[in-house]
Amino acid sequence: MVRITQYNVLCAKLASKARFPKCHEKALDPSSRLTSILNKLEGEIKQNSVICLQELGREWHGDFHDFFQKRKYYMIYSSYGSWKSDYMGVAIAYPMEKYTSENTQIVRISDNVPKVPSPSPVSWWYSYFNNLLIKFNLMSKLSYNEWLESSYKANTCIMTTLSSIDNPSEKFVVSTYHMPCSFYHPKVMTIHVVELLKAVHKYAEESP
């Protein structure tokens, strides 16, 4: 039986008292959080789980790499964030004594978002100032262009095919993704869900 688990580790840089004022300080301490998270993953490793991670930032990337390597796990990692999110990304880790990976692909989902027609110079400037007004809450968000915003998101999806070492004919597809945090514009997230499902479905269909 294949066991797959996923965990959003919450990028260390984003776990601040300002964002989580009701949390105990120890719960926000990067060192304490890292220890707690790795302890949780130990239980999954004992079960030979395939582990999918989201919001893994640069500060912890090396720690997770060493953690998995010492336990004979291989980690596939993709970073897409900016300095504001510590260049966070997503990862898939699997036990090397149980599986091998093939046809691994890393896809920027926004590359598949249908492109809006190129604006004229006048409409470009209108859109530019319109977005500024929205940003500073000087205009209704009803005029927000979800399709254009969706095409700007850098979030990447990892897709890989794992095959059993004991029985190479047994193969399955694993993918992981972190949705853009556009909570005030849910249509952006809906667009990404649709494009994500299309990308994973296409990958699975084309996998041997």
Feature map (PLM): residue ranges:
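N-terminal, active-site-proximal structural segment of metallo-dependent hydrolase catalytic domains
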Residues: 1-70, 80-90, 125, 131-133, ...
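Feature marks short, surface-exposed loop/turn motifs that line or immediately flank catalytic pockets
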Residues: 11-13, 180-183
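Surface-exposed beta-strand edges and their flanking turn/coil or helix-capping segments
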Residues: 18-19, 50, 116-119, 187-190
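Glycine-rich loops and low-complexity Gly/Arg-rich segments
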Residues: 28-33, 75-79, 101-102, 116-119, ...
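Alpha-helix termini
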Residues: 43-47, 97, 163-168, 201-208
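Structured beta-strand-rich core segments of catalytic domains in phosphoester-bond hydrolases
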Residues: 50-180
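A long, amphipathic alpha-helix that forms part
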Residues: 184-208
